[in-house]
Amino acid sequence: MISSVRYWFLVALVVIVYVAGMFVTLFENDSAQFAVMAMRMVQENDFINLFKGPQEYLDKPHMHYWLAAFSFKIFGIHDWAYRIPGILATLLGAYSCYGLGRLLYNKDIGKFSALIFMTAQTIVLSNIDVRTDAVLTGFSIFSIWQLVNYLEKGSLTSIILGAFGAGVAFSTKGQIALLVIGICILCHLAYTRKWKSLLSWKLIPAILVFSITIAPMLYAYYLQFDVHPEKVIRGRSNRSGIFFIFWEQSFERLSGQGHGKNSSDFFFFFHTFLWVFLPWTILALLAYWFRVKTFIKLRFQYKPQYEFVTLGGITILFFIISFAQFKLPHYMNILIPLYSILDASYMHSKYRYSKDNTIK
């Protein structure tokens, strides 16, 4: 489909773009503010309390700021040092796209999935304007890949790595990580009918690993908020950080409470997708349309050559997040790996079965 030399040349070009973007001045609002939050951790040697300016911060959990602070500790406080964890997480996400694409289809689709993911406009931007979504996206697709690998092969290592990835993603942005990972896994289980995998003893060590991974974040929230009911956060006292991250966070964004409403447009993410996935948008829309037609024609009967992780995950998650009253374009980033694999599988089928040399 694409020669190895050309493929690695294109990957190298993308990495060069990522590296060049490391030295750009940090953008306002989020990137610069998040970097300052991590810088405060290092300068005050306080890795428990989150502050945004003078205000205590109860929104996104600690992992992104810890990783940035760790980078500052090693390399010093620089714009480029802040971006290193996000870029590494993106490379992990690209490798996970390769792994999941190879697992669900074949090696060629896996390689092309990684390239599509790395070159999508919003992913390139997310490595320059680094927010929490770079780490969230990388570890979410890593978790999905490992958990699907467990369902297919019963690997203990895979389910433990999947649980670890889910824990890091949850500690980065909260419930949205578990929603995305959980729905993708449920879609795979529903399509393959491998429900017995949920009865395995291997879930016990996986749950333990997930709990250990999120424990530092929960402990930090407990110390900052739960033991200080007198603190007033967004006009309310008696705020529990643990209750917030397990329950309140996503509901506040869906309802617009706490953050305000910035868009009630149900189609916001559709017209946002038209530019965030450039230059692959049109092909992705065609891939989605033809895959829906295929599943309807098959009446959703299981066929080994197809998978429902990407199509099901995209459809359900797109529908859910469209109801949110607080929307921003980079909220789409976590779905880009799924679109990349779906897009790659569509183009591979066109290349393999089309008799039109122009398409090839």
Where are these regions (language model features)?
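Transmembrane signal-anchor helices characteristic of membrane glycosylation enzymes that use polyprenol
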Residues: 3-31, 208-225
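Transmembrane-helix signature of polytopic, membrane-embedded enzymes
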Residues: 4-9, 97-119
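Transmembrane-lumen/periplasm boundary regions of multi-pass, lipid-linked membrane glycan transferases
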Residues: 177-328
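Membrane-interface alpha helices of multi-pass inner-membrane proteins
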Residues: 125, 158-173, 318-323
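Short acidic/glycine- and proline-prone juxtamembrane loop motifs at membrane-interface regions
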Residues: 122-136
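Extracytosolic helix-loop segments that constitute the early lumenal/periplasmic catalytic or substrate-binding loops
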Residues: 15-17, 33-56, 63-66, 70, ...
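Membrane-interface transmembrane helices that cradle and orient dolichyl/undecaprenyl
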Residues: 1, 102-103, 108, 143-161, ...
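Transmembrane-helix motifs of polytopic, lipid-linked glycan transferases
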Residues: 84-104, 142
